[in-house]
């Protein structure tokens, strides 16, 4: 559960409506793979991840980023029940994919960075604080099934 004030909820909703989620997802995942190269080990099947330009132009990175942002959007629609919303994804990433749960926090930070880039001056410090709460809540929900 994420506790947002009414003003924070309004800011998140308003700004999210301005976002091209296809672009944000691919860019956020791409940045994660560039900035934290050890995360590439989870994406062996994605082909060329040899450089920043290869990663940022990789169609599989962009496609998976779109899936990530689609799930994130689902979380935005269920802020009061994030653990339930992300239960199956948490289980998948824990039991089958064996993803280090710290990576969820890192990806959340990449999402916030990309939002700042795309939204410019509209992404005020208060809006950033609200989105940081959201990505922290999503990261916690995704890590919920870890033992």
From Swiss-Prot:
Top-level taxonomy: Eukaryota, Metazoa, Chordata, Craniata, Vertebrata
Acetylation among keywords: yes
Record-level GO cellular component terms: hemoglobin complex; myelin sheath
Family: Belongs to the globin family.
Record note on quaternary structure: Heterotetramer of two alpha chains and two beta chains.
SUPFAM superfamilies: Globin-like
Location of the Globin domain: 3-147
Keywords on record: Acetylation, Heme, Iron, Metal-binding, Methylation, Oxygen transport, Phosphoprotein, Transport
Modified residues (Phosphothreonine): 124
Modified residues (Phosphoserine): 21, 45, 51
Impact when changing residue 14 to G: In allele S and allele W1
Modified residues (N6-succinyllysine): 18, 60
UniProt modified residues of type N-acetylvaline: 2
Protein's name according to its UniProt entry: Hemoglobin subunit beta-1
Protein's GO biological process: carbon dioxide transport; erythrocyte development; hemopoiesis; nitric oxide transport; oxygen transport
Further remark: The D-major sequence is shown. See also the entry for the beta D and P-minor chain.
